[in-house]
């Protein structure tokens, strides 16, 4: 997979330093290119009737802001600069350079925040990716005043107050309509709650590319729709066995729907054969809802289950399973004896959370798909603590138990045991509905039996799940979407894949 890199603030600083020190590109050249890139975007959005104001701190982010103000003035726009720390406060070397250049042109500087608040477009260049403390006091007053205006608000690289690594909001935070970030998206711009302050995020190239990693690639990446083009079309010379046999162990009394959703999503993701293991009481419901599924009911012994495991190429276990004694037997048997890849979801995770040693029993690759509540039980951490560092927690769990972890939230995080991580950027709030997780487990399982690659199945599975929800959003809206709508969206995704494929 060739995916979009997502960087932390520290990684971006290293890229800046490497570009200057190894490739000999002066830092001021990068700053000028950053400013020019932002100005190109602004000129494309706003005509010369608009008045601009740039709020500057005293670091390199402020240097970017001053350069933006200069270039806007030179392009015939009206733009003022407001120095939040005062005109006499010393700052970084590049800040001082840009401040002196701006002064030579004698462009407008104001000392009254009220002048700024009367502008049509207000640009935040107060703090960049290096901010590690809460914004309080007079600086908070400045941001608060600006946030109350009707002006368009633009952030340079990151909105001031957003932690560029974890998405925390640190004190009073600039509320942007647009964020122009440099070279690569920052993790904090994508995670909640920081993402709520970013508006539309656009990457502005400044002359830094993958060469500057010097082999030290970031651990976090993301998929987008262009990555669907990397998926191969199904071969014409094939049969149902070509595309894998998936065993879905799901459902309990009154929970037949979970089995149906997971199995149907697997079929709609290309699995050749899907067999459902479920209680006999679910037979009529499942056969009516999904006649394509094979059915095996009332597995009462480990030996009987092992026979079914021998048939399959991969297993999904957990949706609607309950925590009954029989369910516990099924989970324990799968973990101890299965010699095929596993997708573990829902009640199977809840069973494991009562006896974490079970997760050390697996012989083959495992994908776990917990939501925050299930991860809280698995890790014995509060949901709040998990949200403080959702990428780190997913990575820790994956490494600790040698699994691929799909941690479901507003931004689902996929973490592999080898340290590689993905942020899923597809999906919408309509997908926060009963059964959505069952659909995800089926998609991942359906891809897994075809590809036999847990990392690829997990990353693409999460992305395709979200994209399917996006595909049907116009028809359902956020209030009307249900899990089966997401399955309907899979048809649209695969049509797109086949039209754009090789």
Give a label for each model feature.
Residues 39-125, 134-156:
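Nucleotide and nucleotide-moiety/phosphate-recognizing core
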Residues 87-89, 129-131, 323-324, 350-351:
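Short, small-residue-enriched loops and turns at beta-alpha junctions
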Residues 112, 120-134, 315-322, 412:
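Glycine-rich phosphate-binding loop
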Residues 95, 99, 139-143, 176, ...:
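Amphipathic alpha-helical segments in well-structured domains
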Residues 83-85, 113-116, 183, 296-299, ...:
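Short beta->alpha connector loops at strand-helix junctions that form conserved
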């Amino acid at each position: 997979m060739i995916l979009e890199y997502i960087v932390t603030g520290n990684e971006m600083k290293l890229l800046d330093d490497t570009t200057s020190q190894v490739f000999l590109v002066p830092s001021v050249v990068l700053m000028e290119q950053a400013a020019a890139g932002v100005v190109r975007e602004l000129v494309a959005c706003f005509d010369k009737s608009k008045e601009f104001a740039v709020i500057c701190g005293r670091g390199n982010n402020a240097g970017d802001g001053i350069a933006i103000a200069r270039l806007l003035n030179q392009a015939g726009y009206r733009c003022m600069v407001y120095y939040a720390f005062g005109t006499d406060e010393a700052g970084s070397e590049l800040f001082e350079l840009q401040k002196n250049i701006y002064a030579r042109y004698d462009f407008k500087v104001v000392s009254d925040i009220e002048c700024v608040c009367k502008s049509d477009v207000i640009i935040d260049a107060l703090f960049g990716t290096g901010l590690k403390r809460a914004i309080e006091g007079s600086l908070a007053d400045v941001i608060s005043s600006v946030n109350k205006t009707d002006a368009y608000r633009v952030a340079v690289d990151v909105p001031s107050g957003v932690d560029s690594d974890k998405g925390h909001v640190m004190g009073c935070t600039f509320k942007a309509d647009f964020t122009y970030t440099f070279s690569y998206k920052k993790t904090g711009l994508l995670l909640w709650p920081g993402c709520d302050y970013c508006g539309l995020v656009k990457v502005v190239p400044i002359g830094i590319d993958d060469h500057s990693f010097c082999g030290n690639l970031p651990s976090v990446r993301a998929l987008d729709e262009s990555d669907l083009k990397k998926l191969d079309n199904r071969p014409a010379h094939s049969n149902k066995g070509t595309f894998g046999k998936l065993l879905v162990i799901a459902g309990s009394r009154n929970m037949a729907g979970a089995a149906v959703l997971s199995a149907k999503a697997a079929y709609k993701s290309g699995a050749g054969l899907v067999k459902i293991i479920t209680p006999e009481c679910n037979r009529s419901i499942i056969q009516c809802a999904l006649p394509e599924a094979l059915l095996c009911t009332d597995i009462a012994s480990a030996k009987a289950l092992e026979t079914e495991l021998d048939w399959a190429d991969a297993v999904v276990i957990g949706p609607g399973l309950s925590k009954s004694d029989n369910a516990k037997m099924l989970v324990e048997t799968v973990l101890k004896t299965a010699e095929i890849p596993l997708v573990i979801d829902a009640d199977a995770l809840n069973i494991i959370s009562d006896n974490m040693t079970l997760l050390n029993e697996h012989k083959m690759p495992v994908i776990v798909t917990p939501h925050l509540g299930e991860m809280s039980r698995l890790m014995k951490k509060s949901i709040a603590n998990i949200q403080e560092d959702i990428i780190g927690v997913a990575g820790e769990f994956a490494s600790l138990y040698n699994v691929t972890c799909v941690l479901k939230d507003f931004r689902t995080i996929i973490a592999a045991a080898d340290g590689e991580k993905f942020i899923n950027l597809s999906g919408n709030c309509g997908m926060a509905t009963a059964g959505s997780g069952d659909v995800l487990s089926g998609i991942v399982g359906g891809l897994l039996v075809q590809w036999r690659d847990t990392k690829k199945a997990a990353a693409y599975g999460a992305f395709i799940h979200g994209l399917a929800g996006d595909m049907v959003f116009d028809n359902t809206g956020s209030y009307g979407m249900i899990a089966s709508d997401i399955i309907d969206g899979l048809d649209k995704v695969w049509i797109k894949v086949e039209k754009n494929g090789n």
